[in-house]
Design a protein with these regions (language model features):
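Domain-level signature for soluble enzymes in the chorismate/prephenate branch of the shikimate pathway
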Residues: 1-314
Length: 314
């Protein structure tokens, strides 16, 4: 049975995303849940996102499901940093989850809410709601959205910012549902494993790499040019410190397309020649187009092919 690592305890948004991935047949070796509802995988619960990726690296898990980007807070930096260093890992699938929080309390609680347990990322997305509805409550940090529910269930907080799944698992009452300060809050989760053949190209794919560049004038522009001259749509460019020397950075790039698309393949080869290091994070389906797909065989390519095979290059 495949082992899948994710941030615990049970009931986190990551688990919700993973269950949706399983339901859509996106996890290798795991079929959608049968009628008895039993999951076709063994959960490996960890106390952090880097911990979930470490479980894949050290063989305790076959895959990890981790958040990588949030529409409110931006990139999930612990995920990026963990993917960029250590033994290589590869992304095989992604799922975008609409995020809204459930405010939970213990059954029968009727007194004032003096303390609210909240995961810091969740707190940033419900501050206005808490200020309007629970202005006198003190926030108690929790290690995850599901952990906030456990804090409430075990009597260490009067209320918690959590998930509907965690409320059900812990037997808690719902004080408020679908709570979020910004409408359309969404988080993108990815399924990560050890390096292997990528999923087949679908026409709606994403490719991600991490670049390390020499500290030279125009180095970053030159790398970007490899995409622009091939009409490849870059959807994310982000820098992170290397943590090895002050002022040195690595660059995360996402583009539309698959490594088996000729323009993307040519761009990756050019980056390999040009950059100090290129870490390939994978090519995987996005389900729907996230931008302009790379161009197909163009007139210039047909012209060159004609010269090569002797059929003429006119």
């Amino acid at each position: 049975v495949p082992r899948i690592a994710y941030l615990g305890p049970e009931g986190t948004f990551t688990e919700v995303a993973l269950l949706q991935m399983v339901g859509r047949d996106m996890v290798p070796g795991v079929r959608p849940a049968p009628a008895d509802g039993k999951a076709g995988f063994t959960p490996v619960l960890t106390d952090s996102t880097p911990g979930a990726l470490a479980a894949v690296r050290d063989g305790r898990a076959d895959h990890a499901c981790v958040p990588i980007e949030n529409s409110i807070e931006g990139s999930v930096l612990p995920t990026l940093d963990s993917l960029a260093v250590g033994e290589p890992l590869q992304i095989y699938a992604e799922l975008v989850l609409d995020v809204a929080f459930t405010i939970v309390t213990r059954p029968g609680h009727t007194g004032p809410v003096r303390t609210v347990a909240a995961f810091p990322v969740a707190l940033a997305q419900v501050r206005r709601w808490l200020a309007a509805h629970l202005p006198d409550a003190t926030v108690v940090p929790a290690t995850s959205n599901a952990a906030a529910a456990h804090e409430v269930a075990e009597g260490r907080a009067d209320a918690g910012v959590s998930t509907q799944l965690a409320a059900q698992r812990c037997g808690l009452d719902v004080l408020a549902a679908d709570v979020v300060d910004e409408a359309n809050a969404r988080t993108r989760f990815v399924l990560v494993g050890t390096p292997g053949a990528p999923p087949p190209a679908t026409g709606a794919d994403r490719t991600s790499v991490v670049l390390r560049l020499d500290n030279a004038p125009g180095a970053l522009v030159s790398a970007m040019t490899e995409f622009s001259v091939r009409d490849i749509d870059l959807t994310r460019i982000e820098s992170r410190p290397t943590r090895t020397e002050l002022g040195t950075y690595m660059f995360f790039l996402d583009c539309i397309g698959h490594i088996n698309d000729d323009p993307v393949a040519e761009a990756l080869k050019a980056l390999h020649r040009r950059c100090t290091d290129v870490r390939y994070l994978g090519s995987w389906p996005t389900g729907s187009s996230a931008g302009a797909p790379p161009p197909r065989l163009d007139e210039a390519t047909r012209w060159l092919a004609g010269l090569r095979d002797g059929t003429g290059g006119s």
